[in-house]
Regions:
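His-Asp phosphorelay/catalytic-motif detector in bacterial-type signaling
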Residues: 2, 46-48, 72-76
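Short, Lys/Arg-enriched segments at the junction into DNA-binding effector domains
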Residues: 3-4, 116-166
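Two-component/phosphorelay signaling modules centered on CheY-like receiver
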Residues: 11-30
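Acidic catalytic/metal-coordinating carboxylates
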Residues: 34-37, 60-63
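Active-site beta3 strand of CheY-like receiver
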Residues: 46-51, 56
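Basic, amphipathic DNA-recognition helix from helix-turn-helix-like DNA-binding domains
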Residues: 60, 66, 70-71, 76-135
Length: 166
């Protein structure tokens, strides 16, 4: 299964290295070098993972992460940055990152962390949470069937609309 990864990294050499190895792992990689552009791409959705540098032109990675989470975008985020102090790692994770890797890094470690994130996400989607029924007033969302009804009448949604809803 091809997974979509958004790499938001201003160093073209690092971005190219990450993209090259992720492509070898059957990932479809989009690379963006400016924070604001990365935010727009991420909010457009459809990514299975975001690899995010912290020190970016246009918008810092922490602010980008904050905005994504404020918009209820819970795409897993792996922060990859030169900021290696404990306070930076803790801040990154508390801001909403799922993992944190400091530069310089081993490409093998990065790939192992990416695979671990994919495994966690896959196991989550196979749990009962993925099959739950969500009810809010007269709205019923059935995740397993990917269906929505309002007052008992089915609502036709595109896959993207359904993903945004849940």
């Amino acid at each position: 299964m091809t997974r979509r990864v958004l790499v938001i990294e201003d160093s073209q050499d690092i971005a190219d290295l990450i993209a090259l190895h992720l492509n070898d792992e059957d990932c479809d990689v989009t690379v963006v070098g400016v924070g604001v552009d990365g935010l727009h791409k991420a909010l457009a959705g459809g990514y299975d993972l975001i690899i995010l540098d912290l020190m970016l032109p246009g918008m810092e990675g922490l602010e980008l992460c904050r905005r994504l989470r404020a918009e209820s975008n819970f795409t897993p985020i792996l922060m990859v940055t030169a900021k290696s102090a404990e306070v930076d790692r803790v801040l990154g994770l508390e801001t909403g990152a799922d993992d944190y890797l400091t530069k310089p890094f081993s490409i093998h470690e990065l790939l192992a962390r990416v695979k671990a994130i994919f495994r966690r996400r896959e196991s989550w989607s196979q749990t009962g949470e993925a099959n739950e029924v969500i009810t809010a007033g007269d709205i019923v969302i059935e995740r397993a069937q990917r269906s929505v009804s309002v007052s008992g009448r089915a609502v036709d949604l595109t896959a993207r609309e359904f993903d945004l809803l849940v």
